[in-house]
Amino acid sequence: MGYAATRTEERVAASLGLLASAPIEFCAGQDVAGGGVLLALPALLAMGLLAHGELYALPPGYYGLTSIFLLLALMALARIPSLEQLRYQASGEWGHLLGLDRIPEVRTLREKVQILCRQAGQAARWNTELAKQWITAEQAAEPVFYADGHVRVYHGKMTALPKHYVARQRLYQRATVDYWINAMDGQPFFYINQPVDHGLVAALREDLTPWLEANVAVSPEHQQRMDADPQVPRFTMIFDREGYSPELFEQLWERRIAVINYHRYPKEDWPAEEFHEETVELVRGVGVQLKLAERGRCAGWPREAGRSRW
């Protein structure tokens, strides 16, 4: 059975097909290597690590879906970069972290992961369900989402990806672009990967806002506000000047989606006398004093706001 395999009856039952999965049973221990990662376990569970497990399935065996998910999550926290590196870890010590006698052998773990990866489309469904759960937990009276793109450099040789400009290195390199939707405090909800990038405007029009429209529920109270006031948006999108497009803004507003964006082609500075000091409440309730000004524009009359330094 291997080193540290002490739950022999359950292992025999699993080998005979009589056990769906071994139950997780944490017990007291001293001087367990890597035990500090368990401090993050409540946070992982609160974020939904084991939620929506019905979307996946594993054949009966000693190591069930819960054990595999926990092991992969704790590996990330312990900075173990690959399954192969588990060969050099104490299997019994890691078993204590999972509430088992030992962790699976690397070959067994690979087989389990391959079974999960062969279930096409399940990862996207799981991601969608988790994102909806996080959005519901963070949703304010008027939902606001921050969209941003990040270039991810590709260092492999398997695919000849197109080149993108990498700002931090000031070079064009083979890369893909991830477009993230975040909460206002920076917590991520979901992302869409674009191997061939057509820009933030196209991503907003074709991918990000359609996903939000399909998966972000409108509360009854917010629906009442929208019915009573045609200027109340369904939700608001915030993004940088890469997404500046008056045509896109007009298309989004036709679907009751508001936009907060930097002007891509600013001209001369606005006169200082147009600015007035206002108190602005930040995400965590902290108030700051800003000097703000506002102008209207004739193209669909989006409001244009300016801010001076404070």
Model segments located where?
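Dynamic "connector" segments at or just before major functional cores
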Residues: 1-171, 176-198, 202-229
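Anionic group-transfer/hydrolysis microenvironments
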Residues: 150, 184, 242, 263-264
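Short, solvent-exposed polar/charged micro-motifs at secondary-structure junctions
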Residues: 154-157, 247, 271-272
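Acidic/histidine-rich, metal-coordinating catalytic segments
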Residues: 227-229, 233-243
